[in-house]
Amino acid sequence: MHRSQPLPPPELRDCPAPAKLNLFLHVTGRRADGYHTLQTVFQLVDWCDTLHFRRRDDGVVARVTDVPGVPAETDLVVRAARALQAATGATFGADIAIDKVLPMGGGIGGGSSDAATTLLALNHLWGLGLARAELMRIGLALGADVPVFVLGQNAFAQGIGEDLTPVELPESWFVVIHPKQHVPTAEIFSDECLTRDTPLSIIAVFAARTNKFDFGRNDLEPIATAKFGEVARALAWLKQHNQHARMTGSGACVFARFPDAATAQQVLERLPPEWDGRCVRSLARHPLAALA
């Protein structure tokens, strides 16, 4: 077993798994293996699932809370823990509880963020001492969005999402709307109408912009809004309050930036009752960044 540190106390509670927003998302190509190449900027925000971990000595990894619609054996949290065991030979296990608030199929990275928090927390609880880059490598095998949460910073991403360059973004407030539709990512990426040839952008061009929140577009947005009417309606409603509102990821959530918390809250108070909405604040760093 790989161990380079003395063991900490056996329990780590109240571990945040923050959501992300894609400030833009350009599909730049498709590889021979079927994966799409992208360019995007990931913005971390303070809307979080919360995970709790207890170390076990018997090697068993158990999710001890129910997550509707997600069997434990396929949950990215369980898969992340087992991937860490496989990569290191760790003989410890863990009981993992999840307070799940981030919507699934929302395009905000909830499952990927839960997996990253699991890697960060168990690397600490099991006394493994793996470097952040190694945890990112393990995370990439679980999903293309996992590495940015392990990186723990806002980032410009390229490739399939694994080529990450940290970027500094201004403090911001966003209104995020979940129109209560689940959008399957695979269905959006496989649509024959999806354009896959957006020209590559240069990170310096994005970084030099005074307003970083009207850059580019989300290439998946026309597909998702054509297929899912509630996504289209939520986006149209939000555009009445900010013309640069857009979808994050492959949907279903849509978002817009506002100058301050009070303005964002005023918009949220007008939200039609059939949708869920939230006022969120940007994060410069992942709350668990110090664990790696």
UniProtKB/Swiss-Prot annotation:
Keyword Transferase: yes
Record-linked InterPro entries: GHMP_kinase_C_dom, GHMP_kinase_C_sf, GHMP_kinase_N_dom, IspE, Ribosomal_Su5_D2-typ_SF, Ribsml_uS5_D2-typ_fold_subgr
Keywords: ATP-binding, Isoprene biosynthesis, Kinase, Nucleotide-binding, Transferase
Top-rank taxon, per record: Bacteria
KW Nucleotide-binding (keyword) present: yes
Swiss-Prot/TrEMBL GO biological process terms: isopentenyl diphosphate biosynthetic process, methylerythritol 4-phosphate pathway; terpenoid biosynthetic process
GO molecular function terms attached to this record: 4-(cytidine 5'-diphospho)-2-C-methyl-D-erythritol kinase activity; ATP binding
Catalytic activity entry: 4-CDP-2-C-methyl-D-erythritol + ATP = 4-CDP-2-C-methyl-D-erythritol 2-phosphate + ADP + H(+)
EC numbers: 2.7.1.148
Pathway: Isoprenoid biosynthesis; isopentenyl diphosphate biosynthesis via DXP pathway; isopentenyl diphosphate from 1-deoxy-D-xylulose 5-phosphate: step 3/6
Role of this protein: Catalyzes the phosphorylation of the position 2 hydroxy group of 4-diphosphocytidyl-2C-methyl-D-erythritol.
Matching PANTHER family: 4-DIPHOSPHOCYTIDYL-2-C-METHYL-D-ERYTHRITOL KINASE, CHLOROPLASTIC (PTHR43527:SF2)
Name of this protein: 4-diphosphocytidyl-2-C-methyl-D-erythritol kinase
